[in-house]
């Protein structure tokens, strides 16, 4: 009888252990991009790889921008558990702390995506982002980027002087201040409203996304003077989730998420870069589109204007000062 009871006890323990190991997790993330956008497709491919890598134990439902909350409300939604996570431009939360704007797009800091990734993964950026996010109830998993973004304009732009008086859509934070310092008039709009705003003349130009996506979305039909390669922006796109839900994940699933985001980042940059090269050839063959390429001197002039704003932003909060010191050390 004692032997039978002991066997039953061992079996129960094994069953309990197995059920813990086999526990499934289902998460809901909201993207900053609309469905049908190339960025969104790349993000969806990442969620599919996560499910495959985890043997089906971790599933992520990815929703397009605006599905649950507005694009600039996802940080609160994730922190409060309304969403489990988000994939978004960090600069949208500059109103919470100017540090978000500085780390999101320190114009002039990165010449290529790999430089940003080195900073995030090995240069203190990961720790900085989590120090910024954790008070809001988020865990920063990792970063991706679109690479150097294109710039769409209804007016010819061949240098910094042409920015004067230009009504330009730009994200909140440092990038708006840089454009203002260059003489432009920044306008705060979500990406989903850029086409209509250009078409109706609400804005003259837009810091939008990469050249190929702008072209696919029809922006070059209403803004026939794009600047490419971009001179202005390489956004830090964060993949973050609710801190409590992150802590509830087993360590192997945490590692799958962390490593998979690094792969996702390389995937995004490579795919979008290839798309840009193909689309550039199409655009230059279109007689209705004039692609402008700024000289090295004009690009350097814009970078100097941008870097002058770093210290001003750094003075606005302790966190911003920490970001500034890490960037410049």
Regions found by a protein language model. Name each.
Residues 1-9:
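Bacterial N-terminal signal peptides that target proteins for export
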Residues 17-19:
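N-terminal signal peptide c-region/cleavage motif recognized by signal peptidases
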Residues 23-115, 124-127, 131-329:
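N-terminal secretory/targeting leader peptides
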Residues 10-15:
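Hydrophobic helical h-region of N-terminal Sec-dependent signal peptides
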């Amino acid at each position: 009888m004692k032997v039978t009871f002991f066997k039953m006890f061992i079996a129960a323990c094994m069953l309990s252990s197995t059920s813990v190991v086999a526990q499934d997790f289902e998460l809901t993330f909201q993207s900053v991009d609309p469905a049908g956008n190339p960025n969104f497709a790349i993000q969806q491919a990442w969620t599919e790889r996560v499910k495959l890598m985890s043997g089906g134990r971790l599933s992520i439902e990815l929703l397009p921008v605006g599905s649950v909350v507005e694009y600039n409300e996802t940080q609160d939604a994730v922190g409060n558990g309304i969403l489990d996570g988000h994939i978004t431009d960090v600069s949208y939360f500059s109103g919470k702390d100017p540090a978000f704007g500085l780390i999101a797009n320190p114009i002039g800091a990165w010449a290529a995506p790999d430089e940003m990734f080195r900073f995030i993964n090995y240069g203190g950026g990961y720790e900085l982002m989590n120090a910024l996010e954790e008070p809001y109830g988020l865990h920063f998993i990792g970063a991706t980027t679109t690479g150097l973004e294109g710039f769409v304009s209804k007016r010819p732009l061949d240098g910094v002087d042409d920015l004067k008086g230009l009504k330009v859509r730009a994200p909140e934070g440092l990038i708006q201040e840089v454009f203002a310092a260059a003489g432009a008039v920044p306008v705060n709009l979500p990406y989903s409203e850029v086409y209509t705003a250009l078409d109706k003349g609400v804005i003259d130009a837009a810091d939008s996304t990469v050249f190929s996506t702008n072209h696919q979305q029809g922006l070059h039909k209403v803004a026939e003077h794009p600047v490419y390669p971009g001179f202005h922006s390489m956004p830090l796109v964060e993949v973050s989730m609710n801190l409590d839900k992150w802590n509830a994940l087993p360590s192997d699933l945490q590692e799958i998420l962390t490593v998979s985001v690094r792969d996702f980042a390389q995937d995004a940059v490579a795919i979008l870069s290839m798309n840009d090269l193909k689309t550039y050839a199409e655009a230059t063959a279109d007689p209705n589109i004039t692609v402008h390429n700024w000289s090295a001197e004009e690009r350097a002039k814009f970078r100097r204007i941008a870097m002058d704003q770093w210290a001003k932003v750094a003075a606005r909060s302790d966190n911003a000062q920490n970001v500034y010191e890490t960037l410049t050390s």
